[in-house]
Amino acid sequence: MGTIYEKNKLKIKEYIGVENLFDSFKLNNAGFALMMKVDQYDEIHFTTYYKYGDFVKSSIKKCIISSLKKKQKYIELDSWNFLIIDLEGDAEDAKNLFQCITNSINQLLNDKKQKIYFSIAAGAIELSKEFYSYDRVLECLNFSLNRAEGFNGNKFYLFDMQHYIRLKRKEEILKHIYWAINHDFEGFELYYQPIIDINTKSIITLEALLRLKMKDEYIQPKEFISLLEQTHLILPVGRWVLKTAMESWKELQQLIPGLKMNVNMSFVQVNQNNSVQMIIDIIKEIDTTLL
């Protein structure tokens, strides 16, 4: 994401006159920005030589320009990236423009008996007051392009603020998880929920519950557990949980003889070939008499 953003930021800013652009869409609360990228541009260059690659690029440029309306601005960026700004249109106009451009490109290259197939990804945002800065526009636009690149064929993604917020939240949590693991699991905490025998009113079992603190808030388990499993970071964290729970259990045995401890394990952990050996190794570290 950072590559396109950093390389083209100044170029875009100088070309379109950002101050005038922002004055326009703040007043109208309308308009859109559309960034497009040819996915297989490296393959076009290296498998068909530069001459054909230049032809494809110039063809795309012609198709874009021929599809533009009067008040739409076009900028050719680096690495086969193209940007279109419209100060009056909306999301539907952006989608229709992309469809028009891709249809035009397909028709032109088919007429020329194209030698290689490629697809185009496009990310779009509706310009509104929530985009309060130039950097914000580019950040969200580039986010949309990256999302579009995850689809197949010619693909279009319209920026969704709620989707963006959710993904940024995940990124923030995952970044904190990496930090915590690399700092001796700082921020991870274990709480022990007692299970009581209703007849004797005594604690017979404890269940270990994993919690994660990030700055001044506790992250909901449903937010961070799935991230741990998806990234397989559940393996180092899970080992820490088992070891910490066993250490606590050993100490509590002195106060409550016969106390049991339940520790949940993820399928990712259980599915590891060495999961049983890992448990044995942890027990050996704590107290071999427990074996």
Language model: regions and residue ranges:
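Nucleotide second-messenger and two-component phosphorelay signaling modules
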Residues: 4, 20-32, 36-39, 47-51, ...
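Catalytic strand-loop-helix junctions within cyclic-nucleotide turnover domains
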Residues: 85-94, 112-137, 162-166, 194-200, ...
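Active-site core of bacterial EAL-family cyclic-dinucleotide phosphodiesterase domains
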Residues: 4, 17-20, 169-227, 264
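Catalytic core regions of nucleotide second-messenger enzymes
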Residues: 75-78, 105-121, 149, 217, ...
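Cyclic nucleotide signaling catalytic output domains
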Residues: 74, 100, 121-130, 136-151, ...
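Conserved long alpha-helical elements within nucleotide-processing catalytic cores of c-di-GMP signaling
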Residues: 2-32, 39-65, 75-79, 91-99, ...
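Alpha-helical scaffold within the catalytic cores of cyclic-nucleotide enzymes
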Residues: 61-68, 93-111, 139-142, 241-250
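Catalytic core of bacterial c-di-GMP phosphodiesterases, primarily the EAL and HD-GYP domains
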Residues: 202-206, 233-291
